[in-house]
Amino acid sequence: MNKFVSIALCSSLLGGMAFAQQTELGRNPNVRLLESTQQSVTKVQFRMDNLKFTEVQTPKGMAQVPTYTEGVNLSEKGMPTLPILSRSLAVSDTREMKVEVVSSKFIEKKNVLIAPSKGMIMRNEDPKKIPYVYGKSYSQNKFFPGEIATLDDPFILRDVRGQVVNFAPLQYNPVTKTLRIYTEITVAVSETSEQGKNILNKKGTFAGFEDTYKRMFMNYEPGRYTPVEEKQNGRMIVIVAKKYEGDIKDFVDWKNQRGLRTEVKVAEDIASPVTANAIQQFVKQEYEKEGNDLTYVLLVGDHKDIPAKITPGIKSDQVYGQIVGNDHYNEVFIGRFSCESKEDLKTQIDRTIHYERNITTEDKWLGQALCIASAEGGPSADNGESDIQHENVIANLLTQYGYTKIIKCYDPGVTPKNIIDAFNGGISLVNYTGHGSETAWGTSHFGTTHVKQLTNSNQLPFIFDVACVNGDFLFSMPCFAEALMRAQKDGKPTGTVAIIASTINQSWASPMRGQDEMNEILCEKHPNNIKRTFGGVTMNGMFAMVEKYKKDGEKMLDTWTVFGDPSLLVRTLVPTKMQVTAPAQINLTDASVNVSCDYNGAIATISANGKMFGSAVVENGTATINLTGLTNESTLTLTVVGYNKETVIKTINTNGEPNPYQPVSNLTATTQGQKVTLKWDAPSTKTNATTNTARSVDGIRELVLLSVSDAPELLRSGQAEIVLEAHDVWNDGSGYQILLDADHDQYGQVIPSDTHTLWPNCSVPANLFAPFEYTVPENADPSCSPTNMIMDGTASVNIPAGTYDFAIAAPQANAKIWIAGQGPTKEDDYVFEAGKKYHFLMKKMGSGDGTELTISEGGGSDYTYTVYRDGTKIKEGLTATTFEEDGVATGNHEYCVEVKYTAGVSPKVCKDVTVEGSNEFAPVQNLTGSAVGQKVTLKWDAPNGTPNPNPNPNPNPNPGTTTLSESFENGIPASWKTIDADGDGHGWKPGNAPGIAGYNSNGCVYSESFGLGGIGVLTPDNYLITPALDLPNGGKLTFWVCAQDANYASEHYAVYASSTGNDASNFTNALLEETITAKGVRSPEAIRGRIQGTWRQKTVDLPAGTKYVAFRHFQSTDMFYIDLDEVEIKANGKRADFTETFESSTHGEAPAEWTTIDADGDGQGWLCLSSGQLDWLTAHGGTNVVASFSWNGMALNPDNYLISKDVTGATKVKYYYAVNDGFPGDHYAVMISKTGTNAGDFTVVFEETPNGINKGGARFGLSTEANGAKPQSVWIERTVDLPAGTKYVAFRHYNCSDLNYILLDDIQFTMGGSPTPTDYTYTVYRDGTKIKEGLTETTFEEDGVATGNHEYCVEVKYTAGVSPKECVNVTINPTQFNPVKNLKAQPDGGDVVLKWEAPSAKKTEGSREVKRIGDGLFVTIEPANDVRANEAKVVLAADNVWGDNTGYQFLLDADHNTFGSVIPATGPLFTGTASSNLYSANFEYLIPANADPVVTTQNIIVTGQGEVVIPGGVYDYCITNPEPASGKMWIAGDGGNQPARYDDFTFEAGKKYTFTMRRAGMGDGTDMEVEDDSPASYTYTVYRDGTKIKEGLTETTYRDAGMSAQSHEYCVEVKYAAGVSPKVCVDYIPDGVADVTAQKPYTLTVVGKTITVTCQGEAMIYDMNGRRLAAGRNTVVYTAQGGYYAVMVVVDGKSYVEKLAVK
């Protein structure tokens, strides 16, 4: 046991320092800079801060472990534990440095035993199990470590040489037991005349690292270095394996587009084979190029593609970035897209681009973080923290920064499901500190096998991972980090967007310092070290680790690998929008362009097609972008990125050469709710792009020209024409030949991929051209001096359109056969399109030759439209001149339309669109999807605060639904009331045009904050109050509001409801309160030039019992008028039933949206508890409950009220409660109030004292609370009728003491009244296709869904628009229900007899299922067939778990009375020697049968398995692990009711239980598999031609009477209790009807929906009900409606029947 103690020291010497009990340790700086001059003299002062001592048990008794702020123990094992503290200084580039102590102060403490150091502890070790060992130093009469100030060897960080000064303020003499405590040390670090080690040959400073230097070096002075060039960004090189070169383009284009100059280098072009040394040398050369701006390197490929640098104990990517000097400080940030396939790479590219480009204000998962910690650590860890303390410090930091939700998963008891739920619920950051393996986290055991359960599509966190070998990408299978980066669900990225993880076993303490610093940088704790990229945050975090932990920190840095893009712009909180304006058009000759932006620090970039022309940082609201490299671009892209901002992408036109492809014209955009509608006119000259006879030239890639002209003639369908033209290019009689390979497999074979030599000499094989199906000229011959070639003239060949490899041969006499030089002279997999002519014109190009390719259209001019939103393509292939998109996110968007012609695309035409309030059309809530067999069931809750947003209110509403509708066309009705509460004589007034315009009308009402006619400034407090209303169940209020003056729009108002009177004092709590913003101009009406603002529709839920509604204009002054119009109120016919699950509440806090009263005043009222935080707790549903205690560490006398929100109209309340089954008497009552929420307002309607509640056969582990066990009872359901007039319901816990607790969950209120017609319906989509609309129920079922993963979405359709879709993924796996086998159909008389075999004996509705049965452990249940009735089989299996040939035994007690006596609840079974009859006297069954109670026994299961058959029933049991080395008979696992030891476990008859032993973190554990032998229960259902004709069959045969004369399709499915199997079908063909699989004497075609039958006989077409639809001789044509049809043809007396489908 550790104990924290204080040592009384002289406070004056310690500067007021306090010694206190340890809590979470502070991290305050205790080193300051006193003086720093350019003469390279730096004075630094250390002061002791927060010195503490921890008592630990050692072989010499209790000893002390000292700690202080930022002190780190680097003492060798066996040496006294004496932390030191380090700081980095910038020093001379070349000189040796020295340190001198200028002054110091200390005190001494006598008779102190300092504990010996345990040395550096790795994270694959348990610190508690490492003993304290006193070394030789404890016999030496001197102070350790000796020097109080030292210098480390110098290092180089890019352009600055640094050196670490170390302070050792604790000096200890182990012989005299004297501890000398230096409270203050002042040192001077200065140059000497000697040349130092690791000198810096300075080239200048790249400005992008200024903040890093300021943070790293406490004496850094920017003025000491002259930057070569001021740049806001560096450069990135992507080193890519050759096989992925073509897949990286989108990533590189995006990086350039967002302002990071990015280049590509193929790894095999650096060296072949690729080596680590070659990569290292290449990066060094790139770094040393002029400009010194290489900042990022991204490696693309796995280790076998681009190897990591391997040295003893090191597997490193990071060393590639360590360039200057011989230290371990990176100059370049390194990352890796580790991939083994193109799919692996694509998902990493997609997730990175989406994260930087497409995140919006709707991404509410940002700002939510997950902290995971092991239950280990402590004094030997960084800052003396346990992993949990460490993560709590991080969690507090994140909360202070603005993170809105922190999920804490701390051992013991964390499960994979906890992690899966956290990811799938949406998180943006993960900090993990604990054990790890190559494929999993130790805490939770969440690993690569669980990744497939993640559904967090594009809601991707980045991860700071402190664990062993999670990043070992040299492992034999994908490591944990790789799995998270490659994860995807239904083609969408899941998992993580970036992770830093180690390739080796990490040390215990040093990575914690790195993780601390990463989070501090992320949360901007260091103003001089703000980093916005994942590489910048993580690398700078590791620098702090190296500074503090020296050599061990260097090793950790080298192996801590970034998986993902190091330049990734990280996001922490929900983004906000930027307002960006830029010129609509610029000149190509402009030297710069100014972009206005309201976010300083944003980066604005001009680019086109992935090429960057300029980039600048926004300063003082403007980015001035200097432009270079513009040539003839007709449109440019402006991209603006900012920290925690939505990315803005806009199009800028230029005055470049006119694009030959005409754009659309008259583009317009309108919005309705969240629906955007675009309309445009077709291009002005539709054929301009293809029929203009004037030749135009456009560069399509480097040195390749595409010329477009009209074709002289049309080609035959499906063909392309290839033309070769040359005119004595070399003037030597040589010419050219084109070779075309239709199999397209000759590139890299006959056509070389890496050279322009087709054949190296003139010994040319006669069959060289044999693989080429087509040549130009057609008789081209392979020779250096060929007979057939094109020297001066033109030849052509027509080929089938398709994919070809091709090359243009250029024979040279007496030399070789070349491939022509520049342009498209050889291509791999080139597509020649039908209807086009490809004209290759040979020319001299520079010192060589090449070709200009002209592609001519065959006379057509077809085109389609492509639509973009915010720079992202959202629809292509359109032919109509309109487009609609529903569910668009709130905010400003840019929509663009371009025309795609066959030979090119037009410039984009764009329009800005503003979509108002996403919650205007509320979506469904709590959508869930489940599947049984092939049936999918969806369930959801109605929209919250459902509006009825009708922009044109009906002046004649349907009676019974609309209570009030007022448009104020005739002024303010007499039934309305106005109150001028401020008494200035100016209240609400009617207004009419001209001057004041209503919404879509002439009149409205208004209130003034500024009066015309000399009145001037007003400070209104004006009420406009409705007539009396009757809303017993509440209602919906909608109205329209605007500011009369768009330039003075900040009018403030509120909406209130009163259930009593209509005086101002009756309106207290605002239902809606806001200040208007104009945002635009809608109406041309004006008062003295004041332009009216935009009308906004608002919706407010009115509470039950509302009698009056008031509109109050107040807290406004010196604006103008507020206008109000079209007020409508609809009554709710029935309040929706609702259930409180407490899932939105926070653990340890009062439940959200409920009122609590602690009437006894003991400070302990109702609060939320989460099973994710308490291992003894199991919620009724979800994870959260509410609880009240009568004992919690001490006896309590509770009187606690839990009060609902207003539930007016409720008739029943149903709820679930649970108590401690050992102390079940916690008394409670259900109470109601018809008035208020004070305790005195409530009366009892039901109360009880729970008693005699059983456990229900399960316990839920042991509590970590003060008094140990808190076994929870089963959940008890209660339903209580509520009297009429109930407004509030309270649960009161009282009249009890010194018991334990009562828990409540899933409280459901049933509301009364009769429903009225809804104002909306539901529409259901599957995989993007609408499958059902017009639904009014909140459930939907669909049967017969295809196997695989499906996305189901539900949207709400309102009168004026639709809600965003809410979606859920559902997986259909019908094969879990085995089908019949060998189905046959045979004639028997006039009947058809079906026969089949039963499904496979393995009962598949008992398919594999995983359930939690203990703390972090699982049971797997799957079918089996090898256990007899009334018996159970137990199997013990192992595979040399510990590698030392120790094994396991299984002990079973049929009397089930040994648990807690012979079998301890925790700890080993015994230590030392046990009674020889221990087993025989207590356990009836053993595995192995000869198991004996001896720790050295060989009667164990080491490798293999043993088994025993036992009677089904209740047993106590345990699994033992004899260990000779410790002399203990261990019990596997960690104790408690788990699969390794159990009290009263039921082994059910007819089942087999297999216990497989495994390693589990630092210990062992078991997985239990249960196989079920109960017989299958199912029946058969028979279908004929798609119609069910028989169900409930149990026999494997069926007779279909009277059906043998016709052809039919028969199907049989198996119906299980839990679902149905896939159908198995067979076609029945009667005798005399020919099999259509034979040669058919007819033709049958389906084009669209038209069926055509041609034969030399009679043909008939039937539907599947046997109705004849068409008939005739020779040819029959029928237009179908979709579905299945049958065709019968009779030719020469034989009948032929064929079934077909029409889509």
UniProtKB/Swiss-Prot annotation:
One of its GO terms (molecular function) is metal ion binding. It is found in: Secreted. Residues 940-968 are annotated as: Disordered. It comes from Porphyromonas gingivalis (strain ATCC 33277 / DSM 20709 / CIP 103683 / JCM 12257 / NCTC 11834 / 2561). GO terms for cellular component: extracellular region. It catalyses: Hydrolysis of proteins and small molecule substrates, with a preference for Arg in P1. Ca(2+) 2 binds at V324, D327, Y329, E331. The gene is rgpA. Keywords: Calcium, Hydrolase, Metal-binding, Protease, Secreted, Signal, Thiol protease, Virulence, Zymogen. The keyword Ribonucleoprotein does not apply. Ca(2+) 3 binds at E385, H390, D516. The active site is at H435, C468. Ca(2+) 1 binds at D302, F473, E482. Ca(2+) 4 binds at E517, E520, H526. Its main location: secreted. Its EC number is 3.4.22.37. Thiol protease. Acts synergistically with RgpB to catalyze the maturation of fimbrial subunits, such as FimA. Its proteolytic activity is a major factor in both periodontal tissue destruction and in evasion of host defense mechanisms. Residues 1-20 form the signal peptide. Belongs to the peptidase C25 family. Residues 21-224 form a propeptide. Residues 946-958 have a biased composition (Pro residues). This is Gingipain R1. Pfam families: Cleaved_Adhesin (PF07675), DUF2436 (PF10365), Peptidase_C25 (PF01364), Peptidase_C25_C (PF03785), Propeptide_C25 (PF08126). One of its GO terms (biological process) is proteolysis.
